[in-house]
């Protein structure tokens, strides 16, 4: 297992809503934690989803997001955080039209062999489909 992870070794993956930097994942030797650097592009958002069997902590490092946990929402700015209980539906949106929002995300336990990240998209189901329309 690697104890030190230089930024140059963090695998980055592009999505239509932003970027995930896979900082600590099973393929790097992690057995219980998943740590991600997340960039939400202006106007981007990670639509409603859940992580079966995983808890999550989101920390806003820079920028502002609208964070949903269940049907509740809050505006979070740098230094704020949100805890998402195991399997809870949630979503993160960057409503700013100019500034990227930077987040640190920690999940536990790790699931699967590659990223350790399990996801079930529920954005096409009610009430989630109508919540931000």
Describe the residue ranges of each PLM region.
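Double-stranded beta-helix
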Residues: 3-4, 11-18, 30, 34, ...
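Conserved short histidine dyad/triad with adjacent acidic residue
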Residues: 21, 36-51
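Short histidine-centered beta-strand/loop micro-motifs
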Residues: 25-27, 47-52, 93-95, 121
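A cytosolic small-molecule/anion-sensing beta-strand core signal
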Residues: 36, 61-62, 77-78
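Short beta-strand His + acidic residue motifs that chelate non-heme Fe in jelly-roll/DSBH
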Residues: 48-49, 67-68, 84, 90-97
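Glycine- and acidic-residue-biased ligand/ion/polar-headgroup-sensing regions
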Residues: 53-55, 59-65
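Short acidic-glycine-tyrosine-enriched beta hairpin
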Residues: 71-86
């Amino acid at each position: 297992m690697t104890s030190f992870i230089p930024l140059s070794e963090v695998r980055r993956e592009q999505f239509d809503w932003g970027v995930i930097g896979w900082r600590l994942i099973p393929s790097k030797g992690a057995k219980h934690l998943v740590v991600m650097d997340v960039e939400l592009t202006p106007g981007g958002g990670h639509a409603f989803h859940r992580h079966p069997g995983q808890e999550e902590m989101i920390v806003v490092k820079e920028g502002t997001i609208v964070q949903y946990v269940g049907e509740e929402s809050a505006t979070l700015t740098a230094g704020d955080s949100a805890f998402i209980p195991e399997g809870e539906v949630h979503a993160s949106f960057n409503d700013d039209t100019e500034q990227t929002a930077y987040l640190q995300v920690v999940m536990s336990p790790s699931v699967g062999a590659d990223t350790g990240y399990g996801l079930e998209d529920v954005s096409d189901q009610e009430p989630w489909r109508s919540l931000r329309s």
